[in-house]
């Protein structure tokens, strides 16, 4: 064949040669033929060297092309995402993906049809592999949307959320149809089908889109976020019902419409009456806590594909099949969470951006010029842009008015309305489906895409401008131990992550309880990571009997343990148990909200490290718990304590032993808070308190500043007793002073007394900028414990004594 020269070949031979070489070609009669299975990869540089002009470049083969598109899209959308973060803009990830696809569209337009970039991105007369993969990713996105959605929350939603959700959908639709009917048929630039599609899609609020927006903005655990999620859930369900109802109305005949509705009903019956019970049987057979096998995951994915095929045969929106199947899958562990964990990260980061790129590449950007200058443009573009703007304003208005009538602050009502007016990938996909059915024209589709891109960029920026997360937990009162009356009620919030935290928290509560004259109220919060769901949940077990409700299956051990403690140990302590099912990165919001709502004085958190039973080795080190503790310290509306539990005597179980407590006091508000807590413990019969004050060697003890004066006031009683040579038997309190040269002296002193106590209580900032920590502050591993607290909790400390690190309430807002 002359070294690859095929110019002399007849069309028939040339076609056979090309087909044999790279698997697809245009046949001599003009038909496009492919060899199955097709040749996916290039043979490299040899292809061009052997057959020269007949050979393909490596990017023209399907697998290399797919790899190039995936990498190109991934780096572009990640680049936009990083850029927005650097600029401090609150732009969701889906918006970055849209911009990546839009940029590629512009590059293809500018480079021309024959450029390399167009050859890679634009598929002519061949299967669009990247687009097909993106479409599959979009089906998975819809399926996971259904899995994450908890429809039962509609019945638990506040009236404010329910009314807002319904009004946000129905009001724009009603007004839109009234305006459409007021115009004569001759003066309507849009067809009824176009108007119908736009009116419905612009009025609906997508739950998954709002959940993703709030997650990206870090608002899904805020009070506004919770109302928005409930409202969006109601709105989404109402919108889906309207879509299904629209099927019969848009059918050619009433019989056709009823037939389609019957087939949809059959699908729903199979999903909820057959598939869902099977899933529950699988869960029951596998047992709680055991992982789901891969074969079940694969089986569910097959059902997703079959569901979409069924809905496509009905000429309906195929992803709805995946969505309703997802609703039938039990959310949360083990199946729902396993599906989300296995599929979501890869699908959202890699595959779904391909779908958005494919949508953007189908957009005609030249149509935007007429839309942006629609006052002087044609009537149709003016009508499309006007309708989008009108529905947006109607939706925004009603979403502000309804919550405001329910006594929500105006600023919060505006933020909620902006959230409810957000548009994204769901609306984009419906418009693409409408374009494929020729319900809308290419120009109309392009203008609608532009409106969604602008909406997805501007709405989050407006929300970020109005929403100030630092004001979420503003407290207008002092909520700390130092400002409490001696016999005042102590309200604590105890946080539990795992069963091994229960006993240590109970022992500490028992030690800090004085008497019925000085009441103790304890709120117990069991923290459970949100898996396989979108909506965080806070369950109060005071209003929910054991065995009823989803929260009890997670918290049964916690509830029973504290009920036993309440009945058999301290019946006069008031205990209220909660379960918080939330995203690990935002649990601090739920802790602080509960502390603020219940007027808590002290939050007690477990340390992120857990020791073995003999207290000699570390068995777990969970960074997520440490991250949570650090964030609670930053934004708590009250004082916070971190308990490093290694050995804490239970006085009821060991009545012959006393609990020996030592406070390391250097000075400052955190040390005063630690002393106030320890003084409360010292009023117990079996508690012995030692207060060790560390003084800088050679410096005067006289108060020279406000902090020092406050320290002196707190220690006055103890100093007086010590100077008189007394130890008060009724309080069993000892006061000691020790002069320290530097951190080495402090280290030696603490090591010498390591085995004398059961519990050390220190302030978080104990010894900060003081001679007591000079030389050892650089060795601090955990900043949340402070220098002294970190030293006492370190594995190098000789004894395995428990440590409580206390931070006083940081800020109290001015009433003005």
UniProtKB/Swiss-Prot annotation:
The entry's keywords: Antiport, Ion transport, Membrane, Potassium, Potassium transport, Transmembrane, Transmembrane helix, Transport
Give me any GO biological process, just one.
Answer: proton transmembrane transport
Q: Which GO terms describe its cellular component?
A: membrane
Indicate the transmembrane segments per the record.
64-84, 97-117, 127-147, 163-183, 197-214, 227-247, 255-275, 297-317, 343-363, 382-402, 413-433, 447-467
The entry's family comment says: Belongs to the monovalent cation:proton antiporter 2 (CPA2) transporter (TC 2.A.37) family. CHX (TC 2.A.37.4) subfamily.
Q: What does this protein do?
A: May operate as a cation/H(+) antiporter.
The protein's name is Cation/H(+) antiporter 8
Q: Which organism is it from?
A: Arabidopsis thaliana (Mouse-ear cress)
